[in-house]
Design a protein with these regions (language model features):
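C-terminal catalytic "cap/lid" subdomain
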Residues: 2-124, 128-303
């Protein structure tokens, strides 16, 4: 299998320049996936990781930055709470209802956990649940933007998830990689960090191709690069693979937002990224005048 070629930045000076400007980012959206929040052996929440994540986010606030957390995990937490292992087989007649019931249980438990940990660091957090209609509808989008803006003024960290309890195919965004990019564009963020179970973007699947090369910086999202993610799949816990991360990169970079994919194995990479360290894959923001967020979101399932 040959390694595919994609446009990337290789010059060391360019890499350093792009990384250095991360130090000046003022409004940051951080997304963490379901698999990053749980112990793989049991499916229970990893409280150590949660504590480190909250501490890192609070430290960002203490550095004077506005912060948003987009978190997965509600359905997984709910399934664990009501002892359901596989929604598809547990209730084949109406799996959507089972999924939404698990989300209702899990979202409450997840937020309770976050609130307790944030309180230990004297930080106030807020919950925001979104669907596609939050962005597509002009009034809903306006109100959501105002809510985020007021929370930032109050020094609050918004915790965002999709409203899985009511979302159906017609109004769902579908994964939190995409949701986090939509949120970043909505709040006019200047940096989006996707924490996942991968180090970043490679020229090919490193598990299948030993010659696959790690990509440090991507300056342009070419069609060939976007096609690379379409065959990827996510973990058994989450809903996103590399394809959703590249879609997120498309939304973010088109909105002039830098985006980084980094491994959540060590949550402390967050402050290292903001210190300009060369961690993960950096997608460079490049405003596209033709890009319209509500239109893109409205047509997502049609692409």
């Amino acid at each position: 299998m040959e390694t595919r070629k994609v446009k990337e930045t290789k010059d060391g000076a360019d890499v350093k320049r792009f990384r250095e400007r991360l130090k000046d980012k003022k409004k940051i959206v951080v997304k963490i996936g379901s698999s990053s929040l749980q112990h793989s052996e049991t499916g229970d929440l990893d409280y150590t990781k949660l504590d480190v994540l909250v501490r890192e986010l609070c430290d960002m606030r203490n550095r004077g930055k506005d912060v948003v957390l987009v978190t997965s995990g509600a359905i997984a937490v709910g399934k664990k709470a009501v002892n359901i292992k596989d929604i598809k087989h547990e209730e084949e007649d109406n799996p959507i209802a089972v999924k939404q019931a698990c989300a209702a249980v899990g979202q409450a438990r997840l937020m309770m956990t976050y609130q307790k940990i944030f309180a230990e660091y004297n930080q106030v957090a807020a919950q925001i649940l979104m669907t596609k209609n939050t962005i597509v509808d002009n009034l809903n989008r306006y109100n959501a933007h105002n809510t985020f803006s007021e929370l930032f003024k109050l020094g609050v960290i918004p915790i965002v998830n999709e409203n899985d309890t009511v979302a159906t195919y017609e109004i769902e965004i579908g994964d939190n990689d995409t949701l986090s990019a939509i949120v970043a564009a909505l709040v006019d963020a200047d940096l989006l960090i996707l924490l996942s179970d991968i180090d970043g973007l490679y020229t090919d699947d490193p598990r299948q191709n030993k010659n696959a090369q790690f990509i440090e910086v991507v300056e342009e999202l070419t069609d060939e690069l976007m096609d690379m993610g379409k065959a990827s799949t996510g973990s058994s816990v989450g809903t996103g693979g590399m394809n959703t991360k590249l879609i997120a990169a498309k939304i973010a970079t088109s909105s002039n937002i830098d985006m980084i994919i980094a491994n959540s194995k060590d949550i402390k990479v967050l402050h290292r990224i903001l210190d300009g360290k060369n961690i993960g894959t950096l997608f460079v923001g490049n405003k596209e005048t033709y890009f319209d967020l509500p239109e893109f979101v409205a047509n997502m399932h049609n692409n």
